[in-house]
Amino acid sequence: MFEELKPHLIELRKRLFISVACIVVMFIVCFALRSYILDILKAPLIAVLPEVAKHVNVIEVQEALFTAMKVSFFAAFIFSLPVIFWQFWKFVAPGLYDNEKRLVVPFVSFASIMFALGACFCYFVVVPLAFKFLINFGLNEDFNPVITIGTYVDFFTKVVVAFGLAFEMPVIAFFFAKIGLIDDSFLKRHFRIAVLVIFVFSAFMTPPDVLSQFLMAGPLCGLYGLSILIVQKVNPAPKDKESDE
């Protein structure tokens, strides 16, 4: 059994090596440009709470260095995503038919675009609204907000990556439908469960406030509907199966 899996493991190692190498190279580039990247990350906070943004602090000796490394890795991961998606496709492509292999460019493009849409939605909508709500809530309770650059970057990277990955739902649905694992009737049948899972996922992946949770759950419910339409085109359920349901 191991001998049968060995070629696949070698191929997996190759694809992982290329992906990691790309991230390392991009990390070096991004670390050199860390000041510009950090300015981009702070822009949503400056836009809605300029006075608070002036007083972002560093309270630990190593915090500035660790934050710079974290920001550089975050940017490197984002810029490496097209290569990562490409390597994933190259790994699964040998098991697909020739007509399915022609989907490589649409797959990589679609996956990259959906991640970018999720990240942009988070950057321009979710992060400003969430920060404004959370900071103003603290001010209304007579708390004096002390924001460190480390906590801000942790918050920012967590929600942006979460939204980017969450927006991959139609891509995953397309892939599963293409290999025959799901059809549109499966998604329709489990719609209520999916909504529950979406809200639980949103609660874990967003800050602990209702606004952020709904800002993630709302678009995800819409993307689930889009996934149904995509799967309906790619792998529609047989008519007799639909009538039984």
Regions found by a protein language model. Give the residues of each.
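Membrane topogenic/interface segments and analogous intrinsically disordered interaction regions
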Residues: M1-E245
